[in-house]
Amino acid sequence: MSRTPGFSFSELARDGHARTGVLSTPHGDVLTPTFMPVGTQGSVKTLTPAEVAATGARIVLGNTYHLWLRPGPELVAQLGGLHAFTRWPHAMLTDSGGFQAFSLAERRTLVEDGFVFRSHLDGARKALTPEVAMEVQGLLGADIAMQLDVCPPGGAPRPEVEEACRLTTRWGKRCLAAKRPSQALFGIVQGGTSVALRMAHADELGALPFDGLALGGFSVGEPIAMMHEVVAQIGPHLDPTRPRYLMGVGTPIDLVHAIGAGVDMFDCVLPTRNARNGQALTQHGKIVIKQARYKEDRSPLDPTCACPTCTGGYSRAYLRHLYMAGEILVLRLLTEHNLHLYGRLMREARAAIAEGRYAAFARAWLGASDAGNANDANETVGATESTESTESTE
């Protein structure tokens, strides 16, 4: 089975289904499990590339739909591709843009050939086919591209989910035929909450020469416990020689569960979007900084956190003042804190797997969340929604 030159994945250690590995790309190695901050418009909101890298991130996600419409892939290519354009020196992944074309655009239609829609920016008529998705992602120049897929809404009837799987497979073959030889391509497994459909679709896509396999179509309205259960069964079923990517998920609790199921890669807007909504995340749950109880609170967000916000002496009282006053600084400080939490979670998970103690590590994280306000964290608006359904609307 063919693989893309300059791209590889090697498993380093395993503890149960959880595993560590190294994802090698033309822009450097990425240790897994890894979390990819979301840079929808070509930046992780409020932070510089150096600040993002300081959280431990070595791969970020860009949104094809938005970059296609503005500034346009031809301009990005002319200016050296996304890495040069954004000044991000490490690995980069772009999604296909299909979800946004269907969910954000006006007067959209799904046909065999792809999506036909009108831009939410200027109403221009656009057609997103597998070939166009590959052309746009090729011009953008990320290390990893995603196939165009069909993501059925939560609660869709089984025939609709089955057809989404079939069409996604057909589109996957067309994406493989159209992709640039230098760009890795991941297939996207659909199937809703049906384990049988998920496994069958994973086998179909696993027979094709994708460089990695992703789980799409989660966090679209299904109960969180159901998502955890399905991922726990389908994760270990995916080809172990390729990286496994859970798209658009999620809370720290979600990530702890999914890592235990053998998932290697994650993205979600939760840490950045929630920060801009005044929510700081900790192992014990969330802190809603505007609440009056923090008005005179001298303590940092988390005394165990090594992020610049917590080690820099910024008190909860000061952060609350900034947020209530509408100061931009607080958005940066909370975003740094939240992304550092995710970076810490990934580092500690990798160490626990390598040392054969992931089960105990997971119990400690989940127990701390249960003892705090984990339920509030899970119910936060946008907390477990996918990249496409949250950050892409901004």
Curated annotation (Swiss-Prot):
Residues bound to Zn(2+): 305, 307, 310, 337
Transmembrane segment boundaries: none
GO BP: any one term: queuosine biosynthetic process
Cofactor entry: Zn(2+)
Keywords: Glycosyltransferase, Metal-binding, Queuosine biosynthesis, Transferase, tRNA processing, Zinc
GO cellular component terms, A-Z: cytosol
Record EC number: 2.4.2.29
Pfam families noted in UniProt: TGT
The UniProt record lists the keyword Transferase: yes
UniProt region (Disordered), positions on chain: 375-394
Pathway stated in the Swiss-Prot or TrEMBL entry: tRNA modification; tRNA-queuosine biosynthesis
Gene3D superfamilies for the chain: Queuine tRNA-ribosyltransferase-like
Keyword Membrane: no
Reactions catalysed: 7-aminomethyl-7-carbaguanine + guanosine(34) in tRNA = 7-aminomethyl-7-carbaguanosine(34) in tRNA + guanine
Active site per database record: 95, 267
Cofactor note: Binds 1 zinc ion per subunit.
Region of interest (RNA binding), residue spans: 248-254, 272-276
GO MF terms held by the record: metal ion binding; tRNA-guanosine(34) queuine transglycosylase activity
Family: Belongs to the queuine tRNA-ribosyltransferase family.
Subunit relationships: Homodimer. Within each dimer, one monomer is responsible for RNA recognition and catalysis, while the other monomer binds to the replacement base PreQ1.
Protein name per UniProt: Queuine tRNA-ribosyltransferase
Organism: Sorangium cellulosum (strain So ce56)
